[in-house]
Amino acid sequence: MQYIISIILIFNISVVNANEIFNLLKIPNLEIYNTNSLNGLKYLYAENNFKIGLKKNISCDKSKKNELDKKYPIVEKNLNKYKAAFLIKNNLKFIILCKNLTISSIKTGGVPNILKRSLILDINFDPKYFERMIHHEFFHMIQAKHNRMFDEALWSKFNRTSFKYAECSTCSDRTDLSLYKNTDGFLTEYSKSIPSEDMAETFSFLMTNKELIKKKIKNDLILNKKVKYL
């Protein structure tokens, strides 16, 4: 009898947790992965596929446990670079882990939401750029929270006068994330899409390979200005 009661209690607690998570984030099918991180982040995972957004245009698939267990330490290691106070200041509390993340059928590494204090991450993202992607997506939250601090018009003036950004990131074919050998103000092709993506790319390199950036800015005046701005 005690065994049966214990099973019922565990089931009820799981239901309560699932309901609380949904009420907070409005994302279905989430379960707790870890809530005891060093900086207070709560890690959740997709137990089943989900679609969210007004038009259900954001979708992500559930991950197998072995996939989660492999990628979680990488995610935690990178996000542990931020102290709890900084995360609170930038409205990040919940990390949602899933795979094959898309927005309107376009693949993406992450979906930040400062209103829900959440960041959805695709653990199936290209391993070469996975760690950078984490910081890239978090930067979008930082910029959204402190929009006045990041003047995109001023940022654009750092570039050569002949250069023009695209109208939007999704209407640009500048998508390559590999590092340029000759930067000339831009670390990757994706940096050339729009100012906010350029900022996020620069920030992501600063958080993952600061020594490389120090070398690059010695011979790149434009990139030097951008790094100092951030």
Predicted feature locations:
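Classical Sec-dependent N-terminal signal peptides that target proteins to the secretory pathway
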Residues: 1-20
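Intrinsic-disorder-associated interaction segments
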Residues: 11-14, 34, 61-64, 68-71, ...
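Non-catalytic architectural context of zinc metalloproteases
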Residues: 19-69, 98-100, 167-180, 196-198, ...
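Non-catalytic terminal regions of proteins
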Residues: 40, 47-49, 90-93, 121
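Auxiliary, metal-adjacent structural segments of Zn-dependent hydrolase domains
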Residues: 50-115
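Active-site-flanking segments in enzyme catalytic domains
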Residues: 94-230
